[in-house]
Regions:
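Alpha/beta-hydrolase fold nucleophile elbow
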Residues: 32-42
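Hydrolase active-site cap/lid region
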Residues: 50-105
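Short alpha-helix in the alpha/beta-hydrolase fold that links the catalytic acid
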Residues: 112, 121, 135-144
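Acidic catalytic loop of the alpha/beta-hydrolase fold
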Residues: 129-134, 162-163
């Protein structure tokens, strides 16, 4: 009886791997003619920039980041100061150490600016000039860090955090469409 149970577990693993391999090949065939834009706002922008520095499939054509931050350290430090009037030291150091202990990564490792620096595919940077949550001042270092591949910038005049699309709907849409269409 144990032999049969064990064989069913082994067979499951064997056939799962084969069917997974088949699924991956089918997915690759399907994606061959796909063009993908990775576009994120706020935390999504941080994720977009984090992905931008990695090797991505050929169907990923470009990136659009809207109000992303330079690094977790910079963003959390800004929030401590602006929302609570607290200095970065010692809270950031302590919290980063706890994060390292508990989750295996420190704030120093989460640097979107370093990923942007490695990025080779085109990227559009968008930020509202009245953004205080992710300070507008973070936009230009990110833009300057992008030295490989095409880049463009859109500053949404008068927009606060994550409101560039709402405040400048037509202009935002046109700029994103124009940027993305150059990758077709």
């Amino acid at each position: 009886r144990w032999d049969v149970i064990r064989w069913s577990e082994i067979a499951n693993e064997i056939f799962k791997v084969k069917s997974e391999g088949r699924r991956v090949k089918n997915e690759e065939r399907r994606m061959k003619n796909t063009r993908q834009v990775i576009h994120g706002i706020s935390m999504g922008a941080a994720t977009t920039m984090a992905v931008s520095g990695e090797k991505t499939p050929d169907y990923v054509k470009c990136f659009v980041e809207d109000c992303g931050y330079t690094s977790v350290w910079d963003e959390f430090s800004a929030q401590l100061k602006d929302q609570f009037g607290l200095p970065a030291f010692p809270l950031m150091n302590t919290t980063s150490a706890l994060c390292q202990y508990r989750y295996g990564w420190s704030f120093a490792e989460a640097q979107q600016i370093e990923q942007v620096r490695k990025s080779t595919k085109p990227m559009l940077f968008i930020h509202g000039d009245k953004d205080a949550f992710v300070p507008y001042a973070m936009l230009h270092p990110l833009y300057e860090a992008k030295t490989k591949g095409r880049k463009a910038i859109f500053i949404a005049k008068g927009s606060v955090h994550a409101m560039a699309y709402r405040d400048h709907h037509e202009e935002y849409t046109r700029i994103v469409k124009d940027f993305v269409s150059k990758e077709e």
